[in-house]
Amino acid sequence: MNSADSRESKSVRVRIAQREDAEKITTVINSAFRAAEGFFVERDRIDVGEVLSFLSSGKFLLAESERSLLGCVYVELRAASQDRAYLGLLAVDPGRQQSGLGSMLMDAAEDYCRALGLRFMDIKVVNLREELAGFYRKRGYVETGTSAFPAEVETKLPCHFIDMSKPLDGDKAT
């Protein structure tokens, strides 16, 4: 990372998204997923309507610098559980990946959930993205099982989700 990138990282702020951010969120998610996930049949990962739907059931945390959206992550409180949250759609602008923004967003999401009194964070990782499972393991997530990949999403290769969980209060994942 050069000194300009270092200065920029100091000016990155994380905030909770509003409905008017939906178009920018859609753009950053589609850019990040398109760059990283070549096993999907070519199409956008998400559209503005889906982002708005997510915003009505959870929160997007945004990393931005001088009004430029650099990345986002989605957090949803699990209705069936009083102590669990779901994290998904972690996306960083392709030109900013490997800069620490993903970790910054993960830290912000975990802190947000801790502040709400939640004890566990759950995620689903596509098994074809082995490097992502490793990233989450380094952050304290452990595998808790597998689940089916949505049949309506076309893929070039068969795949499934690796279910992972992390205790937010120091307990073992369950």
Per-range role (PLM):
Residues 1-7:
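Short acidic N-proximal helix/loop "leader" segments that mark the beginning
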Residues 92-95, 99, 127-128:
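Active-site acidic-Proline motif in GNAT/NAT acetyltransferases
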Residues 52, 60, 119-122, 126-133, ...:
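C-terminal "cap" of GNAT-fold acetyltransferases
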Residues 11-13:
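Extreme N-terminal starter segment of soluble prokaryotic enzymes
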Residues 7, 16-22, 26-95, 106-108, ...:
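Acetyl-CoA-dependent GNAT
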Residues 99, 116-119:
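Short coil/turn segments at alpha/beta junctions that flank glycine-rich nucleotide-binding fingerprints
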Residues 82, 100, 131:
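Residues that form or flank phosphate/diphosphate-binding pockets in enzymes
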Residues 103:
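Residues forming the Rossmann-fold NAD(P)(H) cofactor-binding site
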